[in-house]
Design a protein with these regions (language model features):
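Internal/C-terminal transmembrane anchor helices
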Residues: 201-220, 368-393
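Alpha-helical transmembrane segments of multi-pass inner-membrane proteins
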Residues: 11-37, 50-66, 76-109, 115-196, ...
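Interfacial juxtamembrane loops and adjacent helix segments
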Residues: 240, 251-295
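Hydrophobic alpha-helical transmembrane segments in integral membrane proteins
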Residues: 217-233, 380-413
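Register position in tetratricopeptide repeats
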Residues: 412, 446, 479-480, 513-514
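Short coil turns that delineate tetratricopeptide repeat
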Residues: 431-432, 464-465, 498, 534
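Alpha-solenoid helical repeat scaffolds
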Residues: 404-405, 435-439, 468-475, 501-506, ...
């Protein structure tokens, strides 16, 4: 029996690290390949469920491997994570090249290149996170003559070339910047002595590189100037929202709803430029994860996250063999300043792998193993709790959305009474979804259930900042004879997005009501509708202007 126990311990000593490494990287990394075309692309329910489910398996495996053989587990996990991420990065790059060539379909009607993602931005961010790993592997195997090193060198080179060939086509400035910063980090970590010597001997060359960098940044800005100005405005208004409530949201509202209210206050109370009004929108994300976390959960949570990431970066900085994973983390941190990678499960899987590798290396530095195991155990328990909760959340949401999809056909076909009846059955399950709440409220408005429509649309205001909700609230109040309330809602809509013509058109119709007629206000709003420069001069704009002219003619004010 004793011999058998010794043999079992030796077997576990050898096998558990590999089991932890393979399970961890294969299952978590595979999140990027999980898709379900039958669901709305922005839900990503299947990916969240997959990632949550596999984390309940891999976290205990990681803990067991660390307890049995910490050094070997950390080493194997680090190596397998890098190679698996490069493998999935190569698959994504090939998929993207196939989409450019027309072999594979895109997942977005407006973009040719998306990979397995629904948008080229997250797709490019994923590739940007893998790129520094491939660069690091090339550097460490460069010049080595043994067969295994040569094979690894050329495999890494293939991955790097594939990513570099497709990354520019994604047109994601955030991903480009993350790639440059993270690859620069890897070069500095591997060749820091040579870089330091080069800088001291070739200062003018370094100055030239800095000037080129500034030119690159300027070109990236002017390439999509309105988009860049819009992001700056989002950051400005998000910061104001944080200043109003630094402890985070207490009423369960989403970022979109909080931002919509903050933008409305900004355009009401502050002096703003015409360019700000022109680029204003209704974003679902802050395009800066640190700011968005501060808005939703409080500044302290954002500071805690940044602190953890900086500690992990310091761990990577203390060990040269972690330069690749350190570059991966740097890429993700930079990308998070300009995008929303924590809302994309495939990129969250890369975050998790980077954190697991670097935290594992940090735990090995702790001299007393029992302290390290205690820390790891608490992390695993917290991770398991979060995984179970997230799986339950997205499992319920996915089931509800599957029930909603066939019913939604009624709404889009104009059968509003039947749609409202079916939406009522799903309301408790779907009240978190902004499109569902808007459609349900509009269907109730169309069927004359104005009181109920107002209740549902006010709920929609807690999950969305879209001013169209205010427009429907205004129309509903007008139809029910509550003209002052209708005016309040429509004026709020004009302040939320000042460049929108539609709410001004609705105000023209409101002020033309015999019971609420106001000549001065009617003329003011009519002049805006007739003279404003719309972003898109569509048929709808021309029809609204013609109707306004008819109203003015009827009131004998032309």
């Amino acid at each position: 029996m004793h011999i058998m126990n010794v043999g079992l311990r030796k077997w576990l000593y050898r096998v558990m690290p590999w089991l932890a490494g393979v399970l961890l990287t294969g299952l978590v990394g595979g999140t990027v390949l999980v898709t379900d075309g039958s669901l709305p692309s922005d839900l990503q329910g299947e990916q969240w469920m997959w990632l949550s489910a596999v984390m309940t398996v891999v976290l205990p495996s990681w803990l067991a491997g660390y307890i049995v053989n910490p050094q070997r587990t950390v080493c194997i996990v680090s190596e397998t994570v890098q190679w698996v991420l490069m493998g999935f990065g190569a698959v994504e790059a090939l998929h993207g090249l196939g989409q450019i060539a027309g072999i594979y379909p895109s997942n977005h009607s407006l973009f040719v290149l998306t990979g397995t993602f629904y948008n080229p931005g997250p797709y490019s961010g994923y590739l940007a996170a893998v790129l520094p790993i491939a660069l690091y592997r090339i550097m460490i195997f460069n010049g080595k003559k043994d067969r295994l090193s040569v094979v690894q060198y050329y495999l890494s080179m293939c991955v790097l070339l594939l990513i570099c060939s497709v990354l520019p086509a994604g047109m994601s400035r955030a991903a480009w910047f993350a790639s440059l910063v993270s690859c620069g980090y890897v070069v500095l970590r591997v060749y820091h002595v040579k870089v330091k010597s080069f800088v001291s001997e070739h200062r003018y060359a370094v100055l030239g590189v800095l000037i080129l960098g500034l030119l690159f940044a300027s070109g990236a800005y002017f390439m999509k100037r309105d988009s860049a100005d819009g992001r700056l405005l989002i950051g400005k208004i998000t910061s104001r929202a944080i200043a109003c409530n630094p402890l985070g949201e207490e009423n369960g509202r989403t970022f979109s709803a909080i931002y919509g209210d903050a933008q409305e206050r900004y355009f009401t109370d502050c002096e703003y430029s015409e360019s700000e009004a022109w680029v204003a929108g209704t974003p679902d994300f802050a395009f800066n994860e640190y700011l968005q976390i501060a808005v939703e959960y409080g500044v302290w949570v954002s500071v805690l996250l940044v602190t953890v990431l900086l500690v992990l970066s310091m761990i990577a900085g203390n060990r040269k063999h972690l330069a690749g994973m350190g570059g991966c983390l740097v890429s993700l941190m930079v990308f998070a300043c300009f995008s929303y990678p924590l809302h994309i499960p495939a990129i969250v899987s890369v975050w998790l792998l980077a954190v697991i590798v670097l935290s594992g290396e940090g735990l090995v530095m702790i001299k007393r193993k029992r302290y390290a195991v205690a820390v790891l155990l608490s992390v695993v328990v917290a991770g398991l709790t979060a995984s179970v909760n997230r799986y339950g959340k997205y499992s319920a949401r996915t089931r509800a959305v599957r029930q909603w999809m066939p019913v939604r056909v009624l709404y889009h076909s104009g059968a509003f009474k039947a749609a409202a009846d079916e939406y009522e059955k799903l309301y408790d399950k779907m009240s978190w979804h902004k499109d569902f709440c808007f459609e349900y409220g509009r269907a109730l408005y169309k069927t004359g259930s104005y009181g109920k429509a107002e209740k549902v649309l006010l709920k929609a205001m807690t999950v969305s900042g879209d001013p169209m909700i205010l427009n429907i609230l205004g129309r509903s109040a007008q139809e029910s004879g509550e003209y002052e309330k209708a005016e309040m809602y429509l004026l709020r809509s004009t302040r939320r997005l000042p460049e929108r013509v539609y709410p001004h058109y609705l105000l023209v119709k409101l002020y033309a009501e015999p019971e609420y007629f106001d000549r001065v206000k009617l003329v003011r709003e009519a002049e805006y509708v007739l003279n404003a420069e719309p972003k898109v001069n569509s048929t709808a704009i021309r029809e609204m202007r013609q109707k306004v002219k008819n109203i003015l003619k009827d009131k004998s004010m032309q």
